[in-house]
């Protein structure tokens, strides 16, 4: 029994020694304030223009003769088979698919002038077209002109035909493509193209 008492005493002594080793919890030290360091920002200074140094002018738009370009094409179109006289025609804005800036509004105006008093079609007026574009949420200068949008616009204004036009190629020598489409089916009933006259 003495070994048991010694063993128990040893365990108790060990427990007392270990319990005396527990340190008091230390209070956390306040953190030292850290000041953020902002890296220096190097702003590049624009080069100063010296007096007398000229800025090059933007490239000039080449004058294009839209009337001379569209007249022969419109003449061919009016002689095409399958056109019923007296129907309403919507002339959509000329789409610019060239590699530069093109005065497509002048091209559209030349198409409208060439089709006035043609004897085949009644034209949708620019006012009707502008109102329809606004109602359908299309801007007047919609650069995403597509055949489906043109047909949808023609249906909205009650036209039976739509003239879709696209200027394409190099801006120095563009070509104009015209397509007369039947609104009801979307069928292209006439197509023609020609070089734009300078």
From Swiss-Prot:
A lipid is attached at residue 21 (S-diacylglycerol cysteine). Residues 30-61 have a biased composition (Pro residues). It is found in: Cell outer membrane. It is a lipid-anchor. Pfam families: LpoB (PF13036). Residues 28-62 are annotated as: Disordered. A lipid is attached at residue 21 (N-palmitoyl cysteine). GO terms for molecular function: enzyme regulator activity. Residues 1-20 form the signal peptide. Its main location: membrane. One of its GO terms (biological process) is peptidoglycan biosynthetic process. GO terms for cellular component: periplasmic side of cell outer membrane. Keywords: Cell outer membrane, Cell shape, Lipoprotein, Membrane, Palmitate, Peptidoglycan synthesis, Signal. InterPro entries: LpoB (IPR014094). Interacts with PBP1b. Regulator of peptidoglycan synthesis that is essential for the function of penicillin-binding protein 1B (PBP1b). Belongs to the LpoB family. This is Penicillin-binding protein activator LpoB. It comes from Erwinia amylovora (strain CFBP1430). The lineage of its organism: Bacteria, Pseudomonadati, Pseudomonadota, Gammaproteobacteria, Enterobacterales.
